[in-house]
């Protein structure tokens, strides 16, 4: 009798971690393969390009007409002093925050755009 993939998955799911490690070792020996080598081959494949980006940079592209409001928004978002925030706004395009989550980046972009700035999320 042949087992379906679903039955095999259910059987594996019911095993303990130790039993699964032993199963993997037995399969590696039986088939002459290494699970680590297969994982590296899969990771290097085209799926890598399809992964969703998790860290974003917020770039101030321009201050717009209301520079004072943008400077206040930049100060609030970055914690910079007045002079540093003013210098940052005047040196646009400039990176405001790096490596933040998508939600945080979108919220910051919305806040700065409401103040009149042109903002990019990269």
UniProtKB/Swiss-Prot annotation:
Q: Which GO terms describe its molecular function?
A: mRNA binding; structural constituent of ribosome
The record's section on Pfam families has:
Ribosomal_L12, Ribosomal_L12_N
Single GO BP term? translation
Q: Which GO terms describe its cellular component?
A: cytosolic large ribosomal subunit
Provide the alphabetized UniProt keywords.
Ribonucleoprotein, Ribosomal protein
Family of this protein: Belongs to the bacterial ribosomal protein bL12 family.
Record's function text: Forms part of the ribosomal stalk which helps the ribosome interact with GTP-bound translation factors. Is thus essential for accurate translation.
Subunit description: Homodimer. Part of the ribosomal stalk of the 50S ribosomal subunit. Forms a multimeric L10(L12)X complex, where L10 forms an elongated spine to which 2 to 4 L12 dimers bind in a sequential fashion. Binds GTP-bound translation factors.
| Designated name of the protein | Large ribosomal subunit protein bL12
Which species does this protein come from?
A: Pasteurella multocida (strain Pm70)
